[in-house]
Design a protein with these regions (language model features):
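Outer membrane beta-barrel transmembrane domains
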Residues: 7, 18, 27-55, 60-66, ...
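Outer-membrane beta-barrel translocator/receptor signature
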Residues: 222-225
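Long, charge-dense tracts
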Residues: 1-2
Length: 230
C-alpha cells in the first residue's frame, strides 16, 4: 500500500506493508520520502540563520513488530532510520547538509480490559535524534587591507550532547457507548536531546462525548495549562 500526503510545508510519499506470521506476531514495514520546505529536522532559524527558501529531503525506513502475548496484552516495538539532505538559501549562513542520519525508537506494552472496557499502555521512546552528520555553515573572515571579505565553508557536528527518553503512561476508559475518559502522563529526560536539561513532567486529561472532545494538558516545560476543544 502507498500514497502521497501533503502536510503544510511538507510532502510525503510512503509505501506500507504488513505481514502476519501467525495470530500472535505482526510485522509492519514503512518506507518513503518526506520533502520539507523551510524546515530541517525540527531546526528553528531566523535572521542570518534563516530557513526561508530552504529544502530538505528525508528518506526513511520504519519497522514495527507486534507480539500478542495474550488476547488482551500486546507488546509493540518500532524503529525508524532516516537519511536527510538539506539545501539552504544563498542568503543564509546555513548552506547544506548531506546524508544526515537520524533515528527514533519506541517500546509499548498495551493491556486491554484492566478493569473492564478500558486500555492501559506504558511506553518508553526516543524521539527523532541525529546520530551522525554535519551542517555546513557560510562564515566570513575579517576584511583584508583592501576591504575584501572571504567567505569560507565550516562544518558543524550535528550529533546532540544527550538523548531524550520519554516514559509515558496512558489510560482510556469507555464509561458508556458515547462517553470516554482518557488520562496520560509523561516523564521526559534530557529534553530536546540536551544532556544538561532538567527532567520534565507533563500530563493530559480528556473527555470524549460523541463528536465533542475536551482536554486539559500541562507540563513543567510550558508556561500554563492548555485547554483544547474539538
Amino acid at each position: 500500500d502507498g500514497g502521497e500526503v501533503y502536510m503544510g510545508g511538507s510532502t510525503s510519499l510512503m509505501s506500507t506493508m504488513e505481514y502476519t506470521f501467525n495470530e500472535d506476531v505482526i510485522l509492519g514495514l514503512l518506507s518513503g520520502f518526506v520533502e520539507e520546505k523551510e524546515g530541517f529536522l525540527g531546526l528553528e532559524g531566523n535572521g542570518a540563520f534563516t530557513l526561508d527558501n530552504s529544502s530538505n529531503l528525508s528518506k526513511f525506513n520504519s519497522l514495527k513488530i507486534q507480539k500478542n502475548v495474550r488476547d488482551d496484552l500486546a507488546l509493540t516495538l518500532t524503529g525508524t532510520l532516516a537519511y536527510s539532505d538539506f539545501e539552504g538559501d544563498s542568503a543564509s549562513l546555513l548552506k547544506s547538509a548531506d546524508n544526515v542520519l537520524s533515528e527514533s525508537y519506541s517500546l509499548t506494552l498495551n493491556k486491554a480490559n484492566l478493569f473492564g472496557n478500558d486500555n492501559f499502555a506504558i511506553s518508553i521512546s526516543q524521539p527523532n535524534r541525529v546520530r551522525d552528520g554535519s551542517l555546513t555553515l557560510r562564515l566570513s573572515d575579517l576584511a583584508d587591507i583592501d576591504g575584501n571579505i572571504n567567505i569560507r565553508d565550516t562544518g558543524v557536528d550535528l550529533e546532540p550532547s544527550g538523548r531524550q527518553i520519554d516514559t509515558s503512561f496512558a489510560y482510556t476508559k469507555d464509561i458508556s457507548e458515547n462517553f470516554t475518559f482518557s488520562l496520560k502522563a509523561t516523564i521526559t529526560d534530557e529534553f530536546n536531546h540536551i544532556k544538561d536539561n532538567d527532567k520534565h513532567y507533563s500530563g493530559y486529561i480528556g473527555l470524549n462525548f460523541e463528536n465533542l472532545k475536551v482536554g486539559v494538558s500541562d507540563g513543567t516545560n510550558i508556561s500554563r495549562p492548555s485547554l483544547s476543544l474539538k
